[in-house]
């Protein structure tokens, strides 16, 4: 992890999922938690421990920003997995093995080590190492002062192989049921922390760069006969995560025609919705047309990191029955609905219809924020991103219609029952 080149913003980057997104910020090259609520965490999307018989290590630099009564501590959580044991689904459970500092103790699963009373642990490093030990995994957690590099404490444990398999995450303020952690945090309790230089290595990890989610999250397009001199009109929307003031605000659209890529221009990202929309009249509806969306992420050192999202604007179907994939009510207990999403791709429909309740109030946990507008928008986007994360590949190659229903506007039964 090198956030040092990333501009300040809400969205942490395509390699991570933050719980909840609205409670995290990149500030001066580190991820800062903005809430004292429990179980605020960051999952690595590209690194999962799948080979517990291998070796691994994780290291992170931590600064305590705020520590009050009932300080929930900070550190790693490993072996995080859901019943589905799928890297996206794993992001929404709090089970796993704790390896961090809670109170004045170094904690590694069931093992603890009392830290010296005089130790300065406002800025510390944490190093977790694992390697095979008999039929289990030997773990060692070390903490040290970041400035002096003085070791403050160390604790070891041998745990079952299965207890380390799954996602790995950083946690600010262990404890409580984070999924239900919405609402106002009581005064005088909790803690906040800042994480930098998260480093992961070892053959216990499977590294999958394809798991990145963003900056371009997904796209949706439509193709419509305008019945005017504009002919067929193609509209396409590209979504990114919430970017910062200094970040690039433009998305480019390129299409492949006659074997050549043509640049059709740029569209500006809406600063609330983080959507860029293109409208292209007089579209040739008779042929399949590959497209790619490009977002060029600016770095502090002046370099540019491009991100591409590819798909196909399919020819308008004629002379046969229309093939439509119709879906509704994606509640997140089945997230990411992988069999359904895969079947839609294999079906290769002419059009996809999502007829409502793409999200529910409970999605991803951490409650609903209705005001003020800034955090409320981020709270909504975070839940909506789960929909796109699940169906992004099922939406990119055919027109997609997405209709809101009651839960999409956080008002169950708004259409009836005295709503």
Could you tell me what each predicted segment is?
Residues 55-63, 123-129, 194, 199, ...:
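Residues within well-ordered beta-strands of beta-sheet-rich folds
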Residues 33-112:
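Secretory/extracellular carbohydrate-interaction modules
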Residues 58-60, 117-157:
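Carbohydrate-binding surfaces in secreted/extracellular proteins
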Residues 56, 122, 287-291:
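Exposed beta-strand face motif in extracellular beta-rich ectodomains
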Residues 44-50, 110-118, 157-159, 264-268, ...:
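Beta-strand-rich interaction surfaces with strong enrichment in secreted/lumenal proteins
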Residues 64-70, 132-135, 245:
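Extended, low-complexity, turn-rich repeat/linker tracts enriched in Gly/Pro/Ser/Thr and Asp/Glu
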Residues 147-190, 201, 205-419:
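Divalent metal-dependent phosphoesterase catalytic cores across multiple superfamilies
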Residues 3-31:
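Extracellular glycan-recognition surfaces and repeat-rich motifs
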């Amino acid at each position: 992890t090198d956030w040092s080149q990333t501009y300040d913003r809400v969205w942490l980057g395509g390699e991570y999922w933050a719980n909840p997104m609205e409670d995290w910020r990149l500030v001066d090259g580190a991820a800062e938690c903005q809430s004292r609520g429990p179980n605020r965490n960051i999952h690595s999307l590209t690194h999962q421990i799948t080979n517990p018989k291998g070796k691994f290590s994780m290291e992170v630099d931590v600064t305590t920003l705020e520590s009050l009564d009932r300080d929930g501590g900070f550190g790693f959580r490993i072996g995080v997995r859901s019943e589905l044991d799928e890297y996206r689904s794993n992001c929404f459970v709090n089970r796993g093995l704790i390896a961090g500092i809670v109170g004045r103790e170094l904690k590694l699963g069931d093992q603890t080590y009392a830290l010296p009373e005089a130790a300065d642990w406002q800025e510390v490093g944490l190093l977790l190492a694992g390697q095979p030990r008999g039929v289990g995994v030997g773990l060692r957690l070390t903490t040290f002062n970041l400035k002096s590099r003085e070791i403050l404490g160390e604790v070891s444990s041998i745990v079952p192989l299965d207890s380390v398999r799954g996602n790995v995450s950083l946690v600010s303020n262990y404890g409580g049921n984070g999924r239900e952690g919405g609402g106002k945090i009581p005064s005088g309790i909790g803690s906040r922390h800042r994480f930098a230089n998260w480093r992961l290595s070892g053959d216990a990890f499977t590294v999958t760069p394809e798991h990145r989610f963003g900056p371009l999250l997904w796209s949706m397009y439509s193709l419509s006969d305008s019945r005017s001199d504009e002919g067929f009109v193609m509209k396409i929307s590209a979504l990114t995560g919430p970017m910062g003031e200094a970040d690039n605000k433009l998305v480019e659209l390129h299409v492949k025609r006659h074997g050549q890529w043509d640049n059709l221009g740029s569209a500006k990202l809406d600063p609330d919705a983080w959507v860029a929309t293109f409208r292209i009249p007089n579209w040739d509806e008779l042929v399949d047309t590959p497209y790619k969306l490009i977002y060029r992420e600016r770095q502090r050192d002046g370099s540019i990191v491009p991100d591409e999202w590819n798909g196909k604007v399919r020819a308008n179907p004629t002379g046969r029955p229309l093939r439509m994939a119709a879906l509704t009510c994606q509640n997140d207990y089945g997230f990411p609905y992988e069999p359904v999403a895969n079947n839609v791709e294999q079906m290769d429909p002419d059009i996809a219809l999502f007829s409502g309740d793409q999200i529910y109030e409970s999605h991803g946990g951490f409650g609903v924020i209705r005001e003020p507008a800034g955090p409320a928008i981020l709270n909504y986007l975070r839940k909506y991103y789960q929909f796109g994360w699940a169906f992004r590949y099922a939406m990119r190659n055919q027109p997609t219609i997405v209709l809101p229903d009651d839960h999409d506007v956080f008002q169950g039964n708004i259409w009836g029952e005295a709503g």
